[in-house]
A protein has these predicted regions:
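Segments forming oxygen-rich coordination pockets for charged ligands
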Residues: 1-138
């Protein structure tokens, strides 16, 4: 997690937006659970994982679109063959992923990332809470 936020900070210092994908809910059999994160940079490279395979590919595409459009979104993925919205995985579950566009020009974003890194450096228990009610909340 620390490396992910360090890389996010580097992107922001270069003036580049990025997308942070976070699994916020999972049900049934899924490769990763809630709290798993992946950073996708403007050039399409990624750090972290939200499960690999088809779900990670779809999340990466959604992240690249978020960086391009500068908008966050909430996406649901079905990992069960034959169900509506099936993406071709056979795990048997469902995941909900919050794709959060991180704008380098957002007031206070650098300070927030610095706070996250300082908490991670001392290994304190903490929560990073996202407001999902407004797509451009962060």
């Amino acid at each position: 997690m620390r490396e992910l936020f360090k890389e996010l900070k580097k992107c922001l210092l270069r003036g580049e937006g990025a997308a942070l994908a976070s699994i916020i809910e999972s049900a049934g059999s899924t490769p990763r659970g809630a709290g798993s994160r992946m950073l996708v940079k403007a050039d399409g490279t990624a750090l972290g994982t939200v499960g690999g395979g088809a779900v990670e590919y779809q999340v990466t595409l959604a992240c690249r679109e978020a960086v391009k459009s500068k908008e966050s979104s909430l996406r649901e993925f079905t990992l069960t063959r034959g169900k509506e919205a099936d993406i071709g995985m056979v795990c048997g579950g469902d995941v909900t992923v919050y794709i959060q566009y991180v704008d380098p020009e957002m007031p206070g974003i650098q300070e927030l990332i610095d706070q996250v890194l300082s908490v991670l450096d001392v290994d304190e228990d903490s929560w990073l809470i996202f407001d999902l009610t407004v797509e451009k909340s962060w």
